[in-house]
Amino acid sequence: MWSATMERITVNLAERSYPITIGAGLFEDSAHLSSLTAGQKVVVITNVTVAPLYADKILSLLQSLGCQASLLELPDGEQYKSLDTFNQVMSFLLEGSFARDVVVIALGGGVIGDLVGFSAACYQRGVDFIQIPTTLLSQVDSSVGGKTAVNHPLGKNMIGAFYQPKSVIIDTNCLKTLPEREFAAGIAEVIKYGIIYDAEFFTWLDEHLDALYSLDEQALTYAIARCCEIKAEVVAQDEKESGIRALLNLGHTFGHAIEAELGYGNWLHGEAVAAGTVMAARTAQLQGMIDQQQFDKIFSILSRAKLPVHTPESMTFDDFMTHMMRDKKVLSGKLRLVLPSSIGTAEVVADVPQEVIRQAIEDCRTIN
């Protein structure tokens, strides 16, 4: 069912289609960059954590292709996914007199990918960029699909654009240097795909969680590829999130509220999504959409994955609602939640009674 060979997936968006290449050791091979960068001016943007690990490898590849390569290192952390850091990127590009033919590479996790993608969308009204995600979360989710953004103090990802990369290059060897907490945060998004789209994949994850945590190369390549396949299918159908793409936000309405209330960076995005997914599943159970056994399966796999599965002690129902009503899925003042309707399917539900949401939040303080 799964092998360690390199995987290649295409995101089909007509003339804006692009490849996702997945495998171990891709940083050793310039072929994946050559058609997009050979002889070009290239700016690699990364953070101070990733730069010592991988920047020299990427710069060496680019130089072997005859590129004029520059490096910009930014601070590391969700709190730096901001307009201030965006301005820092703009200043670097302007002061370097880079023209519209520059190629920008996002080398890092979700923060770098979102920030650099938004910068590429805005610089001179749009320049080419390549995603080279180095965390599991960014490899399976944020690097694919063209969502780019920075945060505002009042809400996550509120300032952004849909802007597709020219290519996504995923070297699974990056995961060997990833702290386990960051790896677990990525697993939250992996599990999400099984819950909303693929019951067979959910079962596979339940059976192979230990293999993933031991960084089994075959298991990782298969899991990442399956997530990217699902994301590519969804994005091809609904690039701008007017329909099915909203399902990818399972757990995110609750999760974004946690991140915004407790301060960006205190909870990792995937951690907040995990707790939010449990709250969404409990809401679905209270609404009669899933049964106890299905809820238990969702709770169990997230718990086994060493992720937070309870409501943060310090957050009240009102804290949640303040942030959730700013969610981008709110339409005409009505909160819309992504809820599982079984393991393998989900739907967007409007007008869930606030009493049900309150009970779900409270239940998830102590549920086990």
Curated annotation (Swiss-Prot):
Enzyme class, spelled out: lyase
Any one GO cellular component localisation term in the record: cytoplasm
Keyword NAD: yes
CDD domains named in the record: DHQS
Recorded metabolic or biological pathway in which this protein acts: Metabolic intermediate biosynthesis; chorismate biosynthesis; chorismate from D-erythrose 4-phosphate and phosphoenolpyruvate: step 2/7
Family membership: Belongs to the sugar phosphate cyclases superfamily. Dehydroquinate synthase family.
Name assigned to this protein: 3-dehydroquinate synthase
